[in-house]
Amino acid sequence: MESQLHELAEARWFLSKVQDDFRGGKINVEITHKLLEKLDFPCHFAHVKHIFKENDRQNQGRITIEEFRAIYRCIVHREEITEIFNTYTENRKILSENSLIEFLTQEQYEMEIDHSDSVEIINKYEPIEEVKGERQMSIEGFARYMFSSECLLFKENCKTVYQDMNHPLSDYFISSSHNTYLISDQILGPSDIWGYVSALVKGCRCLEIDCWDGSQNEPIVYHGYTFTSKLLFKTVVQAINKYAFVTSDYPVVLSLENHCSPGQQEVMASILQSTFGDFLLSDMLEEFPDTLPSPEALKFKILVKNRKVGTLSETHERIGTDKSGQVLEWKEVIYEDGDEDSGMDPETWDVFLSRIKEEREADPSTLSGIAGVKKRKRKMKIAMALSDLVIYTKAEKFRNFQYSRVYQQFNETNSIGESRARKLSKLRVHEFIFHTAAFITRVYPKMMRADSSNFNPQEFWNVGCQMVALNFQTPGLPMDLQNGKFLDNGGSGYILKPDILRDTTLGFNPNEPEYDDHPVTLTIRIISGIQLPVSSSSNTPDIVVIIEVYGVPNDHVKQQTRVVKNNAFSPKWNETFTFLIQVPELALIRFVVETQQGLLSGNELLGQYTLPVLCMNKGYRRVPLFSKSGANLEPSSLFIYVWYFRE
């Protein structure tokens, strides 16, 4: 009897929602599409057309209310959702409050759930008032809950800034872009303000500005010696000022590639000061005279990264003085060992360092006399006004690890090209991690990438490089990893590096085949696909799901499902995969949906989603999908089950 009452209540509710649209008798496919949205179940029009055609029995392009209900049930009352619902109900019609709590604790691992939480879920998602009033949930409410943001794969607490933000800047991975002003290739592509706006909205915290002398004493931004278009420096700065803290409160670093004359450098300094005002960091913080401040201490601050002459104390003493026309000579004395990248065992390295220190104390000018050390000089004129705006991010050429350990100051940052960084990460891994534990290190794409392609950033995160700069305008795997990694910590653009990359006494080596420190065993069941994107080449694509793990080399693995033929609307797999992840703190997981097109043409990417392994919820979860360009493809998603434990 109770079951029949609930069925009647559900029928009355459904009729009340749709009957007005059927006053004319039948509806077409466009109204069907809108009505599904009205019922809180938006659907891709391509899928609506397909299901509409299957249910239009008379092939008139119009359907009855019964035919619409069949379409609605096909979309909402999915078999895999109904099976879960039935497992926790006695009559397969209604989920009690206690049964909902049982489901949430046993299946979703919501261990702190209580009656007030379950009532809140019922009130939020149950659309049938009679059922809601009894603190129960129908399949309608349960389906709405399972398809809601609360059941997404990404952990809710990872959507907030939950990490300790009081460590020095060098203790964080920092979301960084390369050639931010470009929105295409590096030879003919246009420069555009949108490059900066888009990067900042995505949470990027380090922007590159390539500055050159312009006409009428107006510095310009473009990729020098190419045919890329030009932007006014002041226009770029104004855009940054508007969007700098829209997504994140934490500091923005402006990495200046400065090719300007002293006169136009002075103009740059004036523009920076007048535009940013108090947001521009122009003096050291009192509590951080000789150590890097934290992101928390630098909230809402703009930092300038550029060459600098003199010390922070000298800069402090000049505050308030007139610097017009004053030019400083920047000198770079480069000491290089003969074979920079050759391996050096720790004992030999310590002897080498001791020798440098002894020579330095005795007579700095004799350093070049050490066997194997070469010396050369470089000079450049810098406007004092611009030099004095560089505080905690002084650009300093990277010579080698030995030199940095002896000479490098706490506020000096290095930029290393990808090829050299890759070589160092393989041959000098311990020294590299020791270096990045102390100094901010930026890795940038090699010059040969004229098409603005990117490298895999994971290999440099593995050795602690803070600023792994990518071409944000170029979609693909590297940017998927970038976007996925920086979803963490509230999308703030700052992620605290794990202990193994901050504490050098741990002796971490990402290249070791095994790292026995509480690995994670991860099990994922790919259950089904929900309204997957339609292929550009076929309305009935053959779908495959690929799971990829990126992290230290030993954790890099790829597994895939079987191919489901001719079904993008609701393909089903029910396939289980297990992964052993040695260093989960550095691991990202990527879900890829492709359509199989044959050996010659290759697979077509339909959607993907990347996130940190430790940001995954357990239980039945929905994986949102994003296009190659990063567009959200909702309601396209995967329905999966996740379980993992740490040894």
Swiss-Prot record:
Summarize the impact of K299E: Defective in Ca(2+) oscillation activity and loss of nuclear translocation
Task: Give, from the UniProt record, the effect of changing R376E.
Answer: Abolishes nuclear translocation
Major site of localization recorded for this protein: nucleus
Q: Which GO terms describe its molecular function?
A: calcium ion binding; phosphatidylinositol-3-phosphate binding; phosphatidylinositol-4,5-bisphosphate binding; phosphatidylinositol-4,5-bisphosphate phospholipase C activity; phosphatidylinositol-5-phosphate binding; phospholipase C activity
Limits of the PI-PLC Y-box domain: 386-502
Indicate the quaternary assembly. Answer: Interacts via its C2 domain with PtdIns(3)P and, to a lesser extent, PtdIns(5)P in vitro.
Enzyme Commission number(s) of this protein:
3.1.4.11
Residues of the EF-hand domain: 43-78
- Where are the catalytic residues? H178, H223
Specify the taxonomic lineage. Answer: Eukaryota, Metazoa, Chordata, Craniata, Vertebrata
Q: Which residues form the PI-PLC X-box domain?
A: 163-307
- What name has this protein been given in UniProt? 1-phosphatidylinositol 4,5-bisphosphate phosphodiesterase zeta-1
Q: In which tissues is it expressed?
A: Highly expressed in postpuberal testis, where expression is sperm cell-specific. Also expressed in brain of both sexes.
Quote the subcellular location field of this record.
Nucleus; Cytoplasm, Perinuclear region
Q: Does the keyword Flavoprotein apply?
A: no
- The residues the entry assigns to the signal sequence are none
Q: Name one GO biological process term.
A: intracellular signal transduction
Q: Which SMART domains match?
A: C2, PLCXc, PLCYc
